[in-house]
Amino acid sequence: MKQKRIALLLALILALSVCGCAADKPQTETAETTAAVENRTAAEGITVTEEELTQTAQWLMEQIPQPTYGSVGGEWAVFGLARSGVAVPKEYFESYGENVAAYTAEHGGVLHAKKYTEYSRVILAWTALGRDAADVGGFNLLIPLADFDQTVFQGINGPIFALLALDSGAYDIPENTAGTTQATRDGYVDYILNAELPDGGWSFAGGDPETDITAMALQALAKYRDRQDVADAVERGLTVLSQQQEENGGFVAYESESSESIAQVIVALTELGVSLTDSRLVKGGNTLVRRLLEFRTENGAFRHIPDGEEDVMATEQGFYALVAVSRAEQGKSTLYTMTET
């Protein structure tokens, strides 16, 4: 099972630095949680309740009592909680801020020599807290993203998350003083477009399109559809996702269905403003949200795979996908748009 998970998440390793972080005991779906899912309006299947958000938020805070710098148990949990509207003790966010500021200062502002998604991830969490990414422990974390060559060094994840981070707070790209290629938004967009596969969609290392990478590319491109080449690529990407979707509403890769893939597609649709009941991504009457909630346990956590254990990483992604849905239902700005309420 662990080997399957490593294979399934190969495309995410450089972006999210994922690792297996499951709780000790497995959870089985109860009659109560099954009924809760089945009782959702069949015509919509997209409702996210305040109780669901609150319960999952509480689970995350219990599992991650001291959030700090890190791809699991760090930025993504803080990011989701900050964007959720759920009541979170101010000390929780303050603790994260202090921990990350101290870590950044201790390392001289260098979070990673090669993997610049580390900067993007922190920028997203920092911005979600209403803070300025130009001052994290006394360091401007936007500066590394001004270096185009270093940002794209790790592949497609680099420009995807650079755009999400820069656009989250409508940040200007600083001047690149490293003597390498100056980054621009159009440059990052072009890199993503040039990486599109012949029949649409994206993957980390070529070959067949991967659900997670395709969905994340669409998230990053969402704000650039005034360019016709972007709009066309987005439509091709949506077609790929539609073709990949299973009859139950989920997605399978490397012989395993994962909640994270569903979560990323949900976020992509909300960023694009595409209805979660769009016929292209409803199979057999099963919506994305309905299927995602079937991975949710009675404690509010999410499983990575249908019969798996409660998992921190899966819950972080499942949670912020539900937050994206909730924000869309309330007419609020999208998950990654933090310049508006």
Task: Walk through the language-model features, giving the residues of each.
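Bacterial N-terminal signal peptides that target proteins for export
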Residues: 1-8
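Hydrophobic helical h-region of N-terminal Sec-dependent signal peptides
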Residues: 9-15
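Terminal, non-catalytic domain-edge segments
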Residues: 32-55, 291, 306-341
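An alpha-helical repeat/solenoid feature that recognizes helix-turn-helix modules
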Residues: 65-89, 110-135, 151-185, 198-235, ...
